[in-house]
Every structure is written in structure tokens, then in C-alpha cells.
Amino acid sequence: MKKIFSLLALASMMVLAMGTMGASAAKAPQNDKAVVVVSFGSTFDDTRTKDIGGIEEAVAKAFPNRDFKRAFTSYIIMERLEKNKGIKVNDLPTTLKELKKAGYKDILVQPTHLLHGEEYEQKVLTTVDKFKGDFDRIVVSDPLMVGKNDFAIAASAVATQFPTLGKGEGVVLMGHGSPRDNNQSFGNTYKMLQETFDKMGLPVVVGTVEEVDTPNVDEVLEQIKARGYKTVHMFPLMIVAGDHANNDMYGDEEDSWKSLIEKMGVKTIGHLQGIGRNAAVQAIYVQHAVAAEAGVQR
């Protein structure tokens, strides 16, 4: 009888041991590498999915060895998303804190900003600097345009969204603008981009929604008149087609770009799609991320 009890006890111990092993296997060590795609954000569902989501998907696919995380920088957008739609998106500091707590050691941060402006520097670079001691490695990738060589690449990518243009037709691109941009060593980004489109022989006028920046809407109107366009296709030179695109660019208000251009007798055609859904633009961000991971950033 004692022998039977001993065998039963041994069997029970083996079952418990196997259960413990199974539990340990289920909790196998997680991946300690992550890629964080950080964007300004948007409350517009379509553009958040296709533009921001398009870049996120491309980057995540390029780094299958890294767990993907999303972060936004606009607190107003994050608050509205959570309050009105029940969508919770963390800012970059919170995302990095959670990654640290979860045991991640190698972090790649890919911003979806267009240039080294205030948003990129104050919301991304400054934040990452504060977390450099919390990970074995954390690197930040470049925005879309960094130096002179990027303009032709970016312009060619953006141009893939343009329709076939007829005689008297042109394209108007509305960028956001940045006070920091005016101090760039290589000159004003938007003016340089304009020169690039001109050299490519494309009928494009580039402007910024910020009136204090340049080229502003007045300069855009002057260019449309000087070039003699009868019809202009309007696109946001922004990752998302959000508030600026839907209201400032192509809204029905008297001071929208659409209204001001139509007052000149020029027909407008709106294309409310951000450049984030553009596969060629996505490819540029992926290239920057790959370079950052390899430690060959400019």
C-alpha cells in the first residue's frame, strides 16, 4: 500500500512539474526590441487609418524583429480621441515608460514629421534624450526631409499622387510651416522644395498654412496668377488630411485657400489625402529607419 501511495505521490509531483514547465513555456521571454512610430495624430478616422496607419504598417513590416508601438504628440488630439471615440493613444514619454517597465532594451523611434521643426525637436528629440539612460540603446530616425539631397527624393515621391495634368492646370501644395524652419542652414524647406519642383518641370506651387511663415497664402496666390493656371489641384503637403486640409485648404469659409483661389476665377479640385498613404513616401521613412538602426544617420 505504501508503495502505491509513493507512486501516486511521485505521479502528482510530475504532473505539477509539467504544469509549471508549461506555464513557463507560455511565458517565454518576450522580444526586447521595439519600434515606436510617433506622429502628431489626427481625429479624422480615414486619414488616421490610411495616412498614419500606412506609414506605421510599412515600418512595422520592415522590422519584424521589433514589437510595434504607436505614439502621438498632440495632447488635444489624444484627449479628443479618448473622450469622443474611446480610442486611447499614449504620448511618447508614456510609451517609453511602458516599454522600460515591460523590459525592452533596444528602442527605435521613427517620427512621421516632414522636417526638423519645433514639433520634431521639442516633442521627439527632447523626450528621447531623457530616456537614454533607461535602455541599452535608443535611437531616433530622421523625418522625411533632412538635407538638400532629400528634396528631389521627396518631391518625386509626392508627385506620384498627382493626376495627369492638362493645359492650364497646376498643383497647389499646402504645407504646415515651422518657425524653426526659417533658421535651417540650407534655407527655407518649402522654398527649396518649390525650386526642386521647378527644376523637375512640374507645375507646382508650394505654400504654408502659417501666415507668419513663407511662402504664405499671399505668395501662393501671386504664383498662381503669374503662372496663368486656370485649374489647380489642391493637396495637403502633410502626412494627414486633417483639419488644415479640410478647412484651411479646402473648406467653404471665405478665407480658405479654395475660396481665395476661386475668387481669382481659377477652378479648384480638392484631393483630401495626406502623403502618409503614399507608398513612395512610406518607403522614404522606412529607409531612414533602417539607416538609424544601422547607425548610419546623417
Where are these regions (language model features)?
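Sec-dependent N-terminal signal peptides of Gram-positive bacterial secreted proteins and lipoproteins
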Residues: 2-23
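Active-site-proximal alpha-helix that buttresses catalytic centers in soluble enzyme cores
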Residues: 26-298
